[in-house]
Regions:
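Helix-turn-helix DNA-binding module
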Residues: 129-145
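Short amphipathic alpha helix immediately N-terminal
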Residues: 114-131
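N-terminal interaction/assembly modules
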Residues: 1-114, 160-169
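DNA major-groove recognition helices of helix-turn-helix
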Residues: 147-161
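Secondary-structure boundary/capping motif
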Residues: 44-47, 118-122, 147-148
Length: 169
């Protein structure tokens, strides 16, 4: 009986340790995902503008004959009329634009939660304006390590806003 109880205790300890490691990974993953999303925001804004222009062009002139967006709907073997293809491509483009808008709005709301912070420029400079840490440090009148620490703190706050309690575990 002593041997089986020891085995049970070892299994419980392993499970607790695995849970702890998993929780650390979740918080780290949320931080990294937040960084990826922040880095992508300027490009996503440009892409949205381009997609809106393409949508207007599509509405005025219709789809291009060899467009990838059309071939996706044609190659499955079903015969679709030009109107059905046009409708499908239009819905697809509008869905993509809506998803991009939602992501931009979500990130902008999350960023707004830290905009009043004295070290906000550490976050905006790095992820949104592509400014070097030395230049940010000079503008803020501090060391680059201070910029890094405060940026990490601000990204963590944004991560909590984006991912909720998952970012804390």
């Amino acid at each position: 009986m002593g041997k089986s109880q020891e085995n049970i205790r070892n299994i419980i300890m392993q499970a607790v340790e695995a849970g702890r490691i998993s929780a650390e990974r979740t918080a780290k993953d949320a931080f990294k995902a937040t960084e990826r999303r922040l880095y992508g925001l300027p490009t996503l804004r440009i892409k949205l503008e381009d997609d809106l222009e393409r949508l207007e062009e599509f509405k005025l002139y219709g789809p291009r004959e060899r467009s990838k967006s059309i071939t996706r709907f044609i190659k499955n073997g079903n015969r679709l009329s030009p109107n059905e293809i046009w409708e499908a491509v239009l819905v697809d483009m509008e869905a993509t634009i809506a998803a991009d808008r939602y992501e931009i709005e979500t990130l902008e709301r999350a960023i707004a939660t830290v905009q009043g912070d004295a070290y906000y420029q550490a976050l905006s400079g790095k992820y949104l304006d592509d400014v070097d840490d030395r230049d940010i440090a000079e503008a803020l009148g501090c060391d680059t390590s201070t910029v890094w620490r405060h940026r990490k703190r601000l990204v963590q706050r944004v991560a909590v806003w984006l991912y909720g309690a998952e970012a804390l575990r």
